[in-house]
Amino acid sequence: VRILKERVWNELSKNVAVMPVSTKIQDTILIIKIKDDIFINLNDAGPMSHRFIKKVVKNYKRKFLLSISGWGDADMINFYDKENNFIEPLAAKKHPVGDYLSLIAKLFSANYVIPFSSFHEYQREDSIWANRYVTPMEEYKNGIHHDITFVEPFAFINSEKDGDISSLPLKKKKLVIKKSCEFKDNWNDVLEVDDKKIVKEYFDKFEELQDKVGFINFV
């Protein structure tokens, strides 16, 4: 086990070095240097520490941004109002994902974007309804800015030769719907009064939700 030092280059081999950057939300961004190429792996950390990272990568020619993206289906969309009507999430507006990726790339002075950590779908019988908000693969390049190069996901990038980028010929896996009980969840379980306290204490721990969620009904 090797503990990597933060905000400095940690050399892994002759051509590869990494720099972890922790953020104020207790997440980490990983900057990867392969020869003269830079890969900024945000994963789901968001556009944090961009001023520092921009300085680190400013002298490199090819800078690739890897970031979670999409319409926003994975971000707490299962909400209802007091009349038990489903609240349509922001994901329903289907904002061009390429525009979002381009803006984030420019924040870090990256000139290439690669969709990353974004290729999920829902397979449980009690969550497959959310698949209508999942971003199709072809939508990730929609809205890409003219000065940003889009790289298809699952690509091979040759760091010794500019322009040598090729995508792997992958096929989408067939969706197999599974029952929630396979995951130890049973909607027929009877909840007790003490469970209400457990639920309330759980959500009360998230300070950021206090001014965003008006109420929690225990049903």
Label every PLM stretch briefly:
Residues 23-25, 44-45, 79-86, 106-112, ...:
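Noncatalytic linker/hinge segments flanking ATPase motor cores
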Residues 139-147, 155-158:
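C-terminal, active-site-flanking charged/polar segments
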Residues 200-219:
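Extended non-globular C-terminal regions
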Residues 1, 9-11, 33-37, 81-85, ...:
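A generic short-segment signal for beta-strand/edge and adjacent turn/coil regions
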Residues 1-2, 86-87, 213-219:
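Solvent-exposed, charged interface segments at domain starts and junctions
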Residues 52-144:
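Cap/insert and terminal regions of metallo-dependent hydrolase folds
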Residues 2-6, 149-153:
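Short acidic-hydrophobic, aromatic-tinged amphipathic segments that line or gate anion-handling sites
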Residues 4-62, 66-73, 157-204:
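Core dinuclear metal-dependent hydrolase active-site scaffold
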